[in-house]
Swiss-Prot record:
A motif (DLG motif) lies at residues 29-31. It comes from Rattus norvegicus (Rat). Keywords: Acetylation, Activator, Cytoplasm, DNA-binding, Glycation, Glycoprotein, Nucleus, Phosphoprotein, Transcription, Transcription regulation, Ubl conjugation. The lineage of its organism: Eukaryota, Metazoa, Chordata, Craniata, Vertebrata. Changing S40A: Fails to dissociate from KEAP1 after PKC activation. One of its GO terms (cellular component) is RNA polymerase II transcription regulator complex. Its main location: cytoplasm. This is Nuclear factor erythroid 2-related factor 2.
Length: 604
């Protein structure tokens, strides 16, 4: 045996390389890349993906460790569910000497940016809130403890005690100044935070309106400030027994706000007996006491109780109609204010929000749907005629028709109030807000005639065109040219006449077009109805013909069977229907034709 030497697997011959290149070019033409057949390239890609996966896992593990270390420095807030940084315990150094004690602020290193929660905690630790019944500063407590009880009076003060008192006061003043500096520094640090910039403006406004009291004033007013909250009930008790001068102070401040016109109106209120006696007496007549001889004022408790009962109950519409202030009969005696939106006054200069505009809208309300655009413009151009025709739509009633309102204190039942509400009639709405009565007009008839003229008629009348608008629109061309040749017109009149005739002809053409469309629609509807009737008629005839045809077929089959049963062969036997059939020719002859191919036939 001859041993064959095989090439090592790592080495490839030139023929194999050429074959690989040929196959690769074919695969390239088919869309396959060379890396599919290259094992080393695939191995490199696999190792690269493996390294990327390991790097990604390492990054995730590092991120988890960082998060774990971060959350270890935080604590969970049970109220908000947020993670807050753990603050170290702040030790407050206090001076226990017999002079003055003050809480020192713990030093906190300044960071680039502070959290809002850190600042609030710093503020709470630096300036702890005290109760209402505690002294506002520890300095005052120590100062009050240092002063003996027998030295409180200036009569028994010795020179040594006075010197010690002066030294303690100087120490307190220096401590207060240092406290103020520390407070200002802390506030500046707080307001340097971006989240608290919105509070800076409020702090400035408060700094402008408030002042810092001096230490001497604080020491002298300490006792009064200490008992301020506890003295509120006594202050409430003294409100009832305050002097009338205190109450007049509010009236003076109110009168200083008003203008001179309003002040004169207020003075007229005091001098007007109708307003003082009639206005609102139905509302609070239950708790207004009669003026006695001693001139005693009703107690504030009774007034507040009656007022709460009045405001607690609902106000009915009938009660408003019974009130003299809401009754139009007493409008002459009431004083009206400028710019009133109460709905009572209709005089003087009202604002845009006043109910006068709603009154005007009700007088000159929306026109009937039959009005055209030209009539609407004509109504807008002639408001005087509309104003004169406005009260015509309102029914007039005599003074005897109105029911005199009665106060509810006289014991009337609810049914009487309802009947009074139904019988209460409306008065005539005035034409303008400044008039209480409808003005008399002499040219009412002519204004009514002008109110019904169209815009073209008004324009033709203004330009003195001698013939009516209907003739301009409806005349034929020859007659219109002849009529125009008889008169002399300027450019404005000619332009108006041409415009009126053009728009009139367009309007007539549009009407004729709509008319033709309607006629075509009606004609189509009629044709559709006729076609439906004819279709129903044909359907009925078809059904009848089908029934007749079915009856004839049945008769024919009966006759066929009868004739076929009468036929006999040579032996006298009847023919089988499965083997023979009858057929008729055009001349009326009937033949017995076998269904199978047989030459013999018989003639009947």
């Amino acid at each position: 045996m001859m041993d064959l030497e095989l090439p090592p697997p790592g080495l490839q011959s030139q023929q194999d390389m050429d074959l690989i290149d040929i196959l690769w070019r074919q695969d390239i033409d088919l869309g396959v890349s060379r890396e599919v057949f290259d094992f080393s390239q695939r191995q490199k890609d696999y190792e690269l993906e493996k390294q990327k996966k390991l790097e990604k896992e390492r990054q995730e593990q590092l991120q988890k460790e960082q998060e774990k270390a971060f959350f270890a420095q935080l604590q969970l807030d049970e109220e908000t569910g947020e993670f807050l940084p753990i603050q170290p315990a702040q030790h407050i150094q206090t001076d226990t000497s017999g002079s003055v004690s003050y809480s020192q602020v713990a030093h906190i290193p300044k960071q680039d940016a502070l959290y809002f929660e850190d600042c609030m905690q710093l503020l709470a630790e630096t300036f702890p809130f005290v109760d209402d019944h505690e002294v506002s500063s520890p300095t005052f407590q120590s100062l009050a403890l240092d002063i003996p009880s027998h030295v409180e009076s200036s009569v028994f003060t010795t020179p040594d005690q006075a010197q010690s008192l002066d030294s303690s006061l100087e120490t307190a003043m220096t401590d207060l100044s240092s406290i103020q500096q520390d407070m200002e520094q802390v506030w500046q640090e707080l307001f340097s935070i971006p989240e608290l910039q919105c509070l800076n403006t409020e702090n400035k406004q408060q700094a402008e309106t408030t002042t810092v009291p001096s230490p001497e004033a604080t020491l002298t007013e300490m006792d009064s400030n200490y008992h301020f909250y506890s003295s509120i009930p006594s202050l409430e008790k003294e409100v009832d027994s305050c002097s009338p001068h205190f109450l007049h102070g509010f009236e003076d401040s109110f009168s200083s706000i008003l203008s001179t016109d309003d002040a004169s109106q207020l003075n007229s209120l005091d001098s007007n007996p109708t307003l003082n006696t009639d206005f609102g007496d139905e509302f609070y007549s239950a708790f207004l006491a009669e003026p006695s001889g001693g001139g005693s004022m009703p107690s504030s408790a009774a007034i507040s109780q009656s007022l709460s009962e009045l405001l607690g109950g609902p106000i009915e519409g009938c009660d408003l109609s019974l009130c003299k202030a809401f009754n139009q009969k007493h409008t002459e005696g009431t004083v009206e204010f400028n710019d009133s939106d109460s709905g009572i006054s209709l005089n003087t200069s009202p604002s845009r929000a006043s109910p006068e505009h709603s009154v005007e809208s009700s007088i000159y309300g929306d026109p009937p749907p039959g009005f055209s655009d030209s009539e609407m413009e004509e109504l807008d151009s002639a408001p005087g005629s509309v104003k004169q025709n406005g009260p015509k739509a309102q029914p007039t009633h005599s003074s005897g028709d109105t029911v005199q309102p009665l106060s509810p204190a006289q014991g009337h039942s609810a049914a009487v109030h309802e009947s009074q509400c139904e019988n209460t009639t409306k008065k005539e709405v005035p034409v303008s807000p400044g008039h209480q009565k409808v003005p008399f007009t002499k040219d009412k008839h002519s204004s009514r005639l002008e109110a019904h003229l169209t815009r073209d008629e008004l324009r033709a009348k203004a330009l003195h065109i001698p013939f009516p608008v209907e003739k301009i629109i409806n005349l034929p061309v020859d007659d219109f040219n002849e009529m125009m040749s008889k008169e002399q017109f300027n450019e404005a009149q000619l332009a108006l006449i041409r415009d009126i005739r053009r728009r009139g002809k367009n309007k007539v053409a549009a009407q004729n077009c709509r008319k033709r469309k309607l006629e075509n629609i009606v004609e189509l509807e009629q044709d559709l109805g006729h076609l439906k009737d004819e279709r129903e008629k044909l359907l009925r005839e078809k059904g009848e013909n089908d029934r007749n045809l079915h009856l004839l077929k049945r008769k024919l089959s009966t006759l066929y069977l009868e004739v076929f049963s009468m036929l006999r062969d040579e032996d006298g036997k009847p023919y089988s229907p499965s083997e023979y059939s009858l057929q008729q020719t055009r001349d009326g002859n009937v033949f017995l034709v076998p269904k199978s191919k047989k030459p013999d036939t018989k003639k009947n």
